[in-house]
C-alpha cells in the first residue's frame, strides 16, 4: 500500500465495512463521533466523521494558508493527557474521518452539571492534567482555539482527563494569528479573538482559565450566554472567584485570575508559568490545604 499511495494517494475508508458501530453517534458542532469496533482486530475506538459541508466552510476561512487538517495536527501528539489519534483520512463518501482511542468516560461539561461529587478532592489533579496537555499543544507550535469543558474528556475510571478536538486548531504563526477568524465557544473566548485583534497561544490560556474557574465553582466569570454576544463582556474584569468559592486556595485563585486577564499583555504568558504558580497547591480549598499541614 505504501508504494501505491505514492502514486494514487491514501485509499479511502469504507468505515461501515471496517467498523461495527456500537453506539449511536454523539453529534458535535462539525462532526459525529461513534463508539466503534474494528472488525479485523476487535479494537474498540472512537470514530469521528466530519460533516462535509461544515468542514468545507471552515477550510474556506483559511483558503490559501495551507492550514493543516485536524487529523494532521492531532496525530502529532503522544501525550498522556491528550486523546491519542490512531489514523485519519477520507471516507469513500468523501468525508474526513479520524480514528482515536476510546476513553469510555464523559466530558467535563457533563460532570460539571450532573456528577460534581466525582471531582471531590481531585480537582487539582484534573487541573494539572489539563494544563500539561495544553502546554504540550503550545510547545508543538499550535493554538487549540477551543479549550472548554466539552473538549476535556474523562477516562472510564475518571482517573485521567484528556484534551481532544483539534478541529479549530491552527499553527501559532502568521497568517493564522492575524485578525479576522472569530471561531470558538463564546463563553470561553478571549477578548482579542472576539474583537478581531491579533492572537497567539494566550487566547487558549484565557479559555483554560475560564474552564478552571468553572471547574472550581460551576459558575463563569461573566454572564453565561448562548451566542457570540456572550463573549462581548470579556474585555471587562470577571467576577472574583472568591464570590463563589470564599474558601478557594489563594495561590490557585491568583493563578486562575492571571489566566483570565482581559489584557493579553498582562495575562499569564504560558502554561509553564501557571503550573509553577500551583506547584505547591494540593487541594483547591484553603481548609483542606490547612489540614494537610
Please give the residue ranges for each predicted region:
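AlphaC helix of the eukaryotic protein kinase fold
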Residues: 56-76
